[in-house]
Amino acid sequence: MRGNSFRMLPFLLGASTAALAGPPFQTDDPEPIDFRNYEFYTFASSDGTPLETDTAGPALEFNWGAAPNLHLHIIVPAAAIFPADGPRAFGIGDIELGIKYRFIQETKHRPQIGTFTMFEIPTGSAPRGLGVGKTWYKVPLWAQKSFGPWTTYGGAGVTVFSVPGYRNYPFAGWLVQRDFGKKWTLGEEIFYHGPEGPLAPQTRPSTLVDVGGYYKFRDPGFQLLFCYGHSAVGQTENYAYLGLYWTWGKKADTDKPGDQDKPAAFRSPGGRGQSSAYLP
């Protein structure tokens, strides 16, 4: 971020995450990975305005299905900032921890609903602009429904700061994606965030339109994730994500409603954190 701040990116996602649902999109979803399953990502992402471009990468993300309907999440990013009128900086960014919990299951006529609370730990250098300097939070609510090869999900939340120069701001997004054969899944999202404060590059609201998806090298265990988007309304902003995804673990006993034709681990890679949901 400009001055003593840093804006870490997700994904699409989503939000990163999320999985894609989450990575690579900025909008996230409520679906945790299966119990006793694991996900690993390595990725790079970028978010830029006329004031500054912030990047993450290489970054590492790990998700663990710690209990039914709940997974734990961590991202450790290398970070870089490129201000339009100041010195560049490189180093470790703020580490992200998260808990995704689904409290309403999907049925034939009802979407699944859950939350993905995130805690950004101040490991990045605030004086160099690679971190905020204090722990900050994301508190969202997400919903998802599947119809054959189609899946739609979205929701809204608030990012909470306690640091001068930053302000609490709302965010919201919605995405539609479709499977094309056995290899491709493509989607498009609309994602909004409010102004983030005078120390952030995102000083005004912005609404972005992002397009991306996944290519399965091995179904479902190894995938390529990609996304690019640009603002349609508000402050000029660009978003990009490119990553690799692996999943492994105990096979789920039963498929979730609406997902009978999809491998358990592929239903939605991860759950967007800095990698797939939108973060400052």
Summary of predicted features, one role per range:
Residues 1-9:
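Bacterial N-terminal signal peptides that target proteins for export
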Residues 21-280:
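Transmembrane beta-barrel domains of Gram-negative outer membranes and organellar outer membranes
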